[in-house]
Amino acid sequence: MRNQDAALACEVLNEEFSKEIEMGEISPVVAEMNLATIAIVGENMKHTPGIAGKLFGTLGRNGISVIACAQGASETNISFVVESKSLRKSLNVIHDSFFLSEYQVLNLFICGTGTVGGSLIEQIRCQQQKLMQERGLKLKVVGIADGHHALFTRAGVDLSHYKEELAEKGMPSSTQVLHDEIIGMNIFNSVFVDCTASAEVASLYKDFLMNNISVVAANKIAASSEYSVYSELKQIARRRGVKFLFETNVGAGLPIINTINDLINSGDKILKIEAVLSGTLNYIFNKISADIPFSKTIKMAQEERYSEPDPRIDLSGKDVIRKLVILAREAGYKLEQEDVEKHLFVPNDFFEGPLEEFWKKV
């Protein structure tokens, strides 16, 4: 019914059933506002098991709460009630699951357009058609953000010209904008991809997961921060039926974390891991010589895109420590960064002050 009729309807019904309410046989009638009813009707639903389970399972995985439901005795329809704000998302989920199943749509929000983010966007652009044709998977980038601008569109960003679109049509970017726009769009089957090295962006993961948005992070900060934060994010993801993945935190494109997960899940206990965990340091030590000074090898590592934007993160051992902590945690150990012993080959005072001072010292 219309919102303006709700109060009168409650009054009439409570008056009609006043005796039953007084005797405690029924509860007083109350009105819940801003709701919507969706009905699925189909002849083929009759005597077909699993339709209701598929429907409510799909809604649940996308964070849509069903307030009430009913199924007709003829088994040809299911009606249910959701919040009005979830109506569009519910319809999209149902159409994708039941009627438009030629492709499974995955809606991506990509934060960061630098070396990692830019390469990912280009890879998606090149593989979109192949994935649709061979895997039935339609990757749609519905949001892109860098340090200056953020662009969101349900229709999907044209990845061939995303830089121009971002500069011309994008709004000023901030973590608050990312938070509000991504959650506010309320899009089904959505994934937030963090290609930054920002602690502020990492702080958004919890709210995204709570709103049934999966998180895939190249950013190491969340998975290597306090163990309580790492553990909470994984627990929320499990409870909400979404993913919190960070495979590229260690080993770039190699499936190291996934392999550790498989070993642990099959009952193995990992006692020791040996690895060269810093591509930057490995590159520097291979290049440094009497002819190539230390400072030049650092510059070369940056030019070859081995190094972090701030090379001190690599040289201080911070990046390696983060990777060690992540590997240990995935192997089942409750390790903090402070538990890792480090021996630096660069004097401590090199890491003090601004980046310009560091370059002068090396």
Short names for language-model regions:
Residues 1-122, 127:
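A conserved regulatory-domain signal marking ACT and ACT-like small-molecule sensing domains
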Residues 4-8, 50-54, 73, 82-89, ...:
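Conserved active-site and cofactor/substrate-binding residues in soluble primary-metabolism enzymes
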Residues 7-14, 53-60, 88-95, 117, ...:
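Predominant activation on well-ordered alpha-helical scaffold segments within soluble catalytic domains
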Residues 68-69, 191-194, 215-218, 244-248, ...:
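General beta-strand structural signal in soluble alpha/beta enzymes
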Residues 106-113, 117-211:
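N-terminal glycine-/serine-/threonine-rich beta1-alpha1-beta2 phosphate-ribose binding loop
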Residues 198-211, 220-248, 252-263:
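Rossmann-fold NAD(P)-binding glycine/threonine-rich loop
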Residues 238-241, 245-304, 314, 318, ...:
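Rossmann-like NAD(P)H-binding beta-loop-alpha module
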Residues 287-288, 295-362:
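Substrate-binding/catalytic subdomain of NAD(P)-dependent oxidoreductase enzymes
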